[in-house]
């Protein structure tokens, strides 16, 4: 959504003015029908929210595409492409977001309850846009679903404070991920499978998740859920979405109750990356054809080895190291990062 008083011409002039101030960049016109860059996306998401509220059945976006070419090839040397992308993102996108938001507030006198969601900036090389990706690997918690399952388990079991204390200790560096994970799982001992089933029923898919998986599969992608969470929930979500395969931690369950243990090895960040690599090798897919999407620090290893690592409404450290960041749209924003002009409606 853009302020009504900001036209297509304004955007073109704005980008050109930024380029005029940058001695390192040229703006190249690659298509004459620039007005056709306005795109409507129809997202057929019908899953209910946690409050059983009706979700809007579509996301509308206005897309502007420009080819920025460096004056010299220095910026595009291997190892510097991400830095070049962040120059554009930090300077052009940040300023554009600020100015457009200010214009919107001035023209609409927006109240404090109104919010203008604009500008996700994806920097793509021409070679990247022409590349055919075949494997898409997703994190689960806060990516394919809106919740963090361990938090939901802790709330239900009444051990929220204990779990939080372990998490904070890990963040202070007092224990590694595997140790903190094992301690949190131990606190789940005695929880019945009835409780697990109840939590499954309350999990909500992220906006655009159903359409994104459906569209990727229609495009020929093999889809994988790679989670540091639990298979009990990951398999349920994968079934809801039609994801091809699942990798997560298997909770030990005995006589209908959680034992407080998981089967080793624990799926941590390094294991996630290994799973992605082994899956690609098994399917005969090059790593240059792999896309990984996540939100947490434990997703960074798999994002780093993929051709495209996408941060989805992620922590700052993840956004800073990702190839692309989605902050405005639902998961369907992945298709912009992949270079698709629009996401066609799906049933």
What function would you assign to each model-found segment?
Residues 18, 99, 103, 156, ...:
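Residues that form generic nucleotide/phosphate-binding pockets
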Residues 136-143, 295-296:
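A short acidic Gly-Thr/Ser loop motif
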Residues 12, 190, 195-347:
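C-terminal cap/substrate-recognition subdomain and adjoining C-terminal extension
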Residues 59-62, 67, 127-131, 140-251, ...:
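Alpha-helical substrate-recognition element adjacent to the catalytic core
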Residues 134-136, 168, 290:
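Residue-level marker of motif borders
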Residues 1-138, 346:
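Non-catalytic pre-domain segments flanking phosphatase-related domains
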Residues 14, 91, 95, 99, ...:
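Exposed alpha-helical structural elements
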């Amino acid at each position: 959504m853009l302020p009504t008083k900001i036209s297509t011409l304004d955007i073109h002039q704005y980008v050109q003015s930024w380029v005029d101030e940058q001695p390192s960049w040229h703006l190249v016109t690659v298509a004459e029908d620039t007005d056709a860059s306005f795109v409507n996306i129809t997202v057929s998401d019908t899953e209910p929210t946690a409050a059983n509220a009706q979700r809007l059945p579509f996301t509308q976006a206005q897309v502007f595409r420009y080819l920025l070419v460096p004056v010299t090839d220095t910026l595009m040397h291997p190892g510097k492409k991400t830095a070049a992308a962040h120059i554009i993102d930090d300077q052009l996108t940040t300023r554009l977001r600020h100015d457009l938001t200010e214009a919107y507030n001035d023209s609409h006198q927006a109240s404090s309850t109104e919010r203008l969601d604009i500008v996700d900036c994806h920097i793509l090389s021409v070679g990247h846009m022409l590349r055919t990706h075949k494997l898409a690997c997703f994190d689960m918690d806060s990516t394919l679903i809106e919740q963090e399952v361990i938090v939901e388990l802790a709330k239900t079991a009444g051990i929220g404070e204990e779990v939080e204390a372990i998490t904070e200790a890990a963040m202070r560096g007092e224990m590694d991920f595997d140790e903190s994970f094992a301690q949190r799982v131990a606190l789940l001992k005695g929880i019945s499978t009835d409780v697990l089933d109840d939590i499954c029923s309350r999990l909500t898919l992220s906006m655009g998740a159903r359409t994104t998986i459906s569209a990727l599969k229609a495009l020929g992608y093999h889809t994988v859920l790679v989670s540091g969470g639990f298979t009990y929930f990951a398999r349920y979500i994968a079934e809801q979405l039609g994801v091809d395969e699942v990798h997560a931690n298997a909770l030990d369950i005995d006589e209908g109750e959680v034992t407080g243990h998981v089967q080793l090895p624990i799926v941590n960040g390094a294991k996630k990356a290994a799973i992605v690599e082994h899956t690609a090798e098994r399917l005969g897919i090059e790593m240059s054809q792999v896309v990984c999407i996540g939100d947490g620090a434990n997703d960074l290893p798999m994002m780093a080895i993929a051709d495209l690592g996408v941060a989805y409404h992620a922590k700052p450290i993840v956004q800073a190291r990702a190839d692309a960041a989605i902050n405005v749209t639902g998961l369907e924003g992945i298709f912009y990062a992949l270079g698709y002009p629009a996401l066609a409606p799906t049933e």
